[in-house]
Amino acid sequence: MRLRVREFRPRTGPLEHRVVQPWHPLRHTTLNDPLGERWGYLLGDHDGLSRLAALFSFAAFSRHTIVHVPLRESLPRTFAPGVPVDLVLAHPSAGLRPSAWPRLRTRLRDGRPLTVRTHEERTAAHAADWHAEWERRHRRATEWLRPDVHARTLFLFGGRDVFAAAATAVGTAAGFGPLEKRARQGHDALVASLTPYLEPDHRWDRPEIDIGFQAHPPLHRFTPPGRPASRRRPRAASA
């Protein structure tokens, strides 16, 4: 998949960071703080979830790149509990500290256009590796997504395989969400979850992040899977 992004090279002291954002904002995708509420809900339409899955895939193979997905200003949903947050994906090797993010974020100016490519087969292979290890080690993996929230931003720190596995979960929501009965009626439908990939937390109120699908209105423009997108209405007869 080809994905248009903006690339920034801000500096903090002697360090230069590489930050990418989606070229067009995910206007119909929202996320709330999963640590404050103990339950996060990532809710999006087909376009938003598809591009977000590609961004997870890109993050998986970009160890020194910070992926920033602005979501706080997305259009509010009917059911969107809690405080809206942005999303940042990064490997530990990117050297990002959440406390340093507000200062770094103010320097994201004059980004240059860039087209990146994601490889679905490679992503699926590394996702399968993560799940195989998870099964082999009795639900104990060596890579997890470590969540943190600071300055109204959810940070997910992780490695290649767990980001790839998360990408497949988001992609599942994008692909199968439109088939849900609630989605066809215009409501949100819970389809997948990022919770299995979060760092183990044995407290009874461990944070969870679920993934939902909701087609944005007007619903008459939404084309269900299996129906040609180019289908046109019959033209009115001329007088």
Label the predicted regions:
Residues 1-239:
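Positively charged, low-complexity terminal tracts
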